[in-house]
Amino acid sequence: MIRHILKIMWNQRCSNGWIFAELAVVAAVLWMMIDTFWVDYRTYHAPLGFDIGNVWRFKLSDLDAKAPGYVPDSLYHSSDPEDLTRLMTQIRQNPEVEDVCVTFYSCPYSNGNSWREVKPVDGDTIYAAHMESFQMRNVTPEYFRLFRIRTVDGEPVYDKVAGRHNVIVITPEMAEGFYHGAPNIVGRRVYHGGHDLSSEIAAVSTSIRTNEYERPEASYFQCLEGETYNSTVSSFGASSAEFCVRMKRPYTQNEMNLFLDGMGERLKVNNLYVYGITPISSFREQQLSQKEREANNKISLMVFMLVNVF
């Protein structure tokens, strides 16, 4: 029957050309829809490269000069990096806390967008002739342990960077662009922020994605340790840090509020203090809601096109 109908349509193709045109449009639209949905599905369910379970972001600020407990400059004997380090230590000592780290515009789902020019010192690659800009994440070494980031070989990145100064961690996409699959990438050096500063590659992490709707891109982590930590904290200010804490078990908002109440003065170092908390999952929901609206608009447009074809 179908062959007979197609045969009739073919014999009358001159008068029924519009039918073939409509079928071609329908087929094209269906293919676009299926291809788009499949790509989005695969992208959404691909590994992110990090884990935000039980992670909270503590909000930091500086006491106002008129606030009770304010420490005047005449009595201030520590620096911003020292205060931030001490605050991390005080919170980490709580038995309910699993880990603590600090980042600057680099926390997952924070919309951080710091870029820096990078070039391999010894790479014979497409990037060797001139500096290229890549997204940079400023993180303390504990970041890799807290968010459970691993190397391409499945080992903890934290073990590769702990206690080391002036090292970076690059993603596989950046490693491929620099060295095109060459062995022994770890230990090589790259220039970043100009030719006056070079850092050693301590590890190649797994691919890192910004969110569930984005594909992984070439990027790198600058490990804040030693002088790099001091200069970065002094530049941005301790209260600008993204202070992340992973708890040992899931907590509700009310339970976390009680946790803060129990910490008391341990949430304050000189004029630096914690004034609030937000689960990282809330930042995820905010960021994905916009992406989901865009995806729904795409679906609506495709359905509209399909309905109009019929």
Enumerate the language-model features and the residues they cover.
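Alpha-helical membrane-protein architecture signal
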Residues: 2-6, 17, 296-302
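Generic structural signal for small/hydrophobic residues in well-ordered secondary structure
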Residues: 40, 58, 91, 97-100, ...
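Acidic-histidine catalytic/liganding microenvironments
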Residues: 12, 91-95, 182, 267
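N-terminal membrane-entry
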Residues: 290-309
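Mid-to-C-terminal secondary-structure elements
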Residues: 106-288
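Membrane-proximal extracellular/periplasmic loop immediately following the first transmembrane helix
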Residues: 36-123, 130
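Short, strongly hydrophobic transmembrane alpha-helices
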Residues: 13-42, 50
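A short amphipathic helical element positioned immediately N-terminal to and/or at the very start
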Residues: 1-10, 87
